[in-house]
Amino acid sequence: MSGPDGFGKDHPIPEQLEYNLPLSYESDKIEVIDSLDINTYLQIWNDCQGGLYKYDFYYGGLESGEIFLRCYEVTSNTPLSEDRLIEQSRVKISSQKQFGKVVNKQPFTIYEGDWDDYYAARVEVWFKSSETNKESKLMEKVYRVEGWMR
């Protein structure tokens, strides 16, 4: 295991910042639509260790393509686990016309930081069209995260 990198200590969560907590699988919390746009919904789940996560994503009509995540530390806008995160979180989707679950428990890892050393991350959900290769951001949500110590 590598030693602490101090990323979370160097990026404290601003006091007035509103953020979400990843859910645990044992949670009995009811999932609710969490956006002003009722056609989007993102939920991050804790996995087996700090820094390891899974995500669910619901959305309205989409053409076929790929869904993936980009994450940034909130106070400095520092990209998190940039290339690896995009590849790990990438899910190919088929065209859909109605609101529904697009991504189910797709794993991803945030490497910056240490266990129990929390900081705020802006989690962005992106879509890349298989027809045009155009990328567009579908939504973002702020979560309290920690890094994976390897």
Can you name each region flagged by the protein language model?
Residues M1-I30:
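A eukaryote-biased signal for short, well-structured alpha-helical docking elements
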Residues Y53-Y55, A121-V123, K141:
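Hydrophobic residues positioned within well-ordered beta-strands of beta-sheet architectures
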Residues G3-D10, Y58, S130-R150:
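Short beta-strand elements
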Residues N77-S89, K137:
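Surface-exposed loop/edge segments in extracytoplasmic proteins
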Residues E87-E131:
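Short, solvent-exposed, Trp/other aromatic-anchored flexible loops in extracytoplasmic proteins
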Residues L69-E73, V125:
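Conserved aromatic beta-strand anchor motif in extracellular beta-sandwich/beta-rich domains
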